[in-house]
Amino acid sequence: MQPSFWHEKWDAQQIGFHLSAVNPLLIQFWSQLKLPANSQVFVPLCGKSLDMCFLAEQGHDVLACELNDLAVSQFYQENNLTHTVEKVGEHKRYSTEQITIYQGDIFSLQNTNSVELAKTSAFYDRAALIAWPEAMRLQYAQQLACLIPAGSVGLLVTLDYPQAELNGPPFSVSDDWMQANMGADFEIERLACEDVLSDNPRFVKKQVSSLTESVYKLTRKG
């Protein structure tokens, strides 16, 4: 996923990945992480997701990162959140009482924000890992591990389908890929795996033969 691709999607508002409500899987499974209310939760590639509002409503402090400036601006505007904006290193830091978003490249985030990141005890990834083609996905997974302190727990959602039948994003991520490429840094527990083909018209129209959605609990080793 090149930055230009992402910016073009937001400029054209071609954001089919954005949900107009909180993700039901987040509502269903978040409590299984058993986090204290005041835990800091890291949300990578957050877009303008309403899931951040849900996490804040649970009493968490949300620390997020998003490449596109329009996405971040729309999040605060559409949710009527008074916020401040300041330049911090290579990033712009948008902040309100419980939700802080660093706008910029996630791969340089630790250079800007190591102090705040060190306070993280949880993370949530609904559409970040699956946004990357396989050639770039491992680099993202390694960066996530780099940003997350040892002992942190997270909820991660994937889609798995025959990649040859449809071009991503979202890209297919299998359970085998998870175990092989993230198992060194995370303890991995799959909480659920459901057939969701009939719920996704784009995949049906493209005659994709199967589509499953999985929810994982990840615990950072170390």
UniProtKB/Swiss-Prot annotation:
InterPro entries: SAM-dependent_MTases_sf, Thiopur_S-MeTfrase_Se/Te_detox, Thiopurine_S-MeTrfase, TPMT. It comes from the Bacteria. Its EC number is 2.1.1.67. Keywords: Cytoplasm, Methyltransferase, S-adenosyl-L-methionine, Transferase. Its main location: cytoplasm. It is found in: Cytoplasm. S-adenosyl-L-methionine binds at residues 10, 45, 66, 126. One of its GO terms (biological process) is methylation. The keyword Cytoplasm applies. It catalyses: S-adenosyl-L-methionine + a thiopurine = S-adenosyl-L-homocysteine + a thiopurine S-methylether. It holds the Pfam family TPMT. PROSITE patterns: SAM_MT_TPMT. One of its GO terms (molecular function) is thiopurine S-methyltransferase activity. One of its GO terms (cellular component) is cytoplasm. NCBIfam families: PRK13255.1 (NF009732), TMPT_Se_Te (TIGR03840). HAMAP family: Thiopur_methtran (MF_00812). Belongs to the class I-like SAM-binding methyltransferase superfamily. TPMT family. This is Thiopurine S-methyltransferase. The gene is tpm.
